[in-house]
Design a protein with these regions (language model features):
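Midchain, well-structured core segments that form catalytic/ion-binding scaffolds
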Residues: 13-178
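Flexible, glycine/charged-enriched surface loops at secondary-structure junctions
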Residues: 2-5, 60-64, 114, 136-149, ...
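A short beta-alpha structural unit
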Residues: 148-157, 169-176, 201-220, 246
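Short beta-alpha connecting loops at secondary-structure transitions
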Residues: 36, 173-177, 207-209, 264-277
Length: 302
C-alpha cells in the first residue's frame, strides 16, 4: 500500500492519427483544449470524436481535470539511441516542440495529353516541391531537427488527369523553440513562392503546436534513482515524439521513462521490445512512483 493513492491513466487519441491534433484527451484534462473542442474533432469521413465515443460506450460524465500530485509515463524510445548504446533506460529530461500543418494546393485539372507543360497548373507538382523543401528545412537544421510530410490526398487521382487539388500534412520538431519558429518561417515563405511559380492557390494552416517541454527535476531525479536502485544502465535523453506527459507537465510535476525498441522502429507492425527491457522499465517506474508518493505525503504533512 502506497502513502499516496496511485492511479493508472489511459488517454484517448494520443496519436491524433484519426482525430487531429494529437494528445487531445490529455490536452483537455490539462486545460489546453476545452471539452467542446476535443469532442468536435472530426475524421476524414466527418465523424466527430464525441460521436464515436458515444458509439463505443466510452463517453463519460465525470468532470474534466482534477488535482494530480505527480505523473510518470513509461514508453518505448521510438528511436535507436538506447539500443545502439546498450542502455536499459532512458531518463527523459525534455520533450521537443512540435508544429503540425495542413496544406492544400489548388490548380487546374486538365487532360494529361493535350495540355502543354508550360501552361499547366499542377497541384501535385507544387506538393512535390514542398516535400523537397520540407526535407531541406530539416537537413539544414540537423541533427536535432525533424521534418516530415506524412499524409497526402490527390484529386482527382486519375492516371490521365493533371491533379487539380492536393492536400498534405507537414510535421516539424525541434527541442529549441526559436529554431522551430525559424522552420515555420522557412515553410511559409517557401510554400508561397512555390505556389506563385506554378500558379496555384494556397491554404496553409498550423493545426497543432506546443513548445519544447522541460520535465520536473524532482521527477526526473526519481527516475534516475530508480534506475540506480535496479542496477540498470541509463542515460539522459530528449523525447523526439509527443506524449501525454507533455500536457500533464503543465499541471503537475511530470517525467518519462524510456526503454529501447528493436532497431529503433516504431509506428510499424514490426515494432518490438525485449522482455528484459520491459521488466527494467516497469521496475524503474515502480521505484519512481513509490518515491514520489512518499515525498508528496511528506510535503503535505509539513
Amino acid at each position: 500500500e502506497t502513502e499516496a493513492p496511485v492511479e493508472v491513466a489511459v488517454w484517448t487519441n494520443e496519436e491524433g492519427s484519426r482525430f487531429a491534433p494529437a494528445m487531445v484527451a490529455s490536452g483537455v484534462f490539462a486545460g489546453v483544449f476545452d471539452l467542446d473542442y476535443g469532442l468536435s474533432r472530426a475524421d476524414q469521413d466527418g465523424l466527430t470524436m464525441g460521436q464515436e465515443l458515444d458509439r463505443i460506450g466510452y463517453a463519460g460524465d465525470q468532470p474534466v481535470g482534477k488535482p494530480v500530485g505527480a505523473y510518470f509515463e513509461a514508453h518505448i524510445e521510438q528511436g535507436p539511441i538506447l539500443e545502439d548504446e546498450g542502455k536499459d533506460i532512458g531518463i527523459v529530461t525534455d520533450a521537443q516542440g512540435q508544429r503540425w500543418y495542413e496544406i492544400k494546393f489548388t490548380g487546374v485539372e486538365a487532360h494529361a495529353g493535350p495540355t502543354p507543360m508550360k501552361t499547366r497548373k499542377d497541384a501535385l507538382l507544387g506538393a512535390a516541391r514542398v516535400i523537397d523543401l520540407v526535407n531541406k528545412i530539416g537537413l539544414d537544421r540537423s541533427p536535432l531537427a525533424c521534418a516530415t510530410v506524412g499524409m497526402m490526398q490527390i484529386h482527382p487521382n486519375s492516371r490521365n488527369v493533371i491533379p487539380g487539388e492536393v492536400f498534405f500534412t507537414v510535421d516539424f520538431r525541434h527541442p529549441d523553440d526559436a529554431v522551430l519558429a525559424d522552420m515555420d518561417k522557412a515553410l511559409r515563405v517557401g510554400v508561397e513562392k512555390i505556389a506563385s511559380d506554378i500558379g496555384l492557390k494556397t491554404e496553409l494552416e498550423q493545426i497543432f503546436y506546443y513548445a519544447p517541454v522541460p520535465f520536473d527535476e524532482s521527477c526526473v531525479d526519481a527516475v534516475r534513482k530508480g534506475a540506480e536502485l535496479g542496477g540498470f544502465s541509463a542515460r539522459e535523453i530528449v523525447s523526439g515524439a509527443g506524449h501525454d506527459a507533455c500536457y500533464l507537465a503543465q499541471v503537475c510535476p511530470t517525467a518519462m521513462i524510456f526503454i529501447p525498441c528493436v532497431d529503433g522502429i516504431s509506428h510499424n507492425e514490426i515494432e518490438e521490445v525485449h522482455k528484459h527491457w520491459s521488466d527494467a522499465g516497469g521496475q524503474v517506474l515502480l521505484h519512481a512512483v513509490l518515491a514520489k508518493a512518499d515525498e508528496i505525503v511528506m510535503q503535505k504533512s509539513d
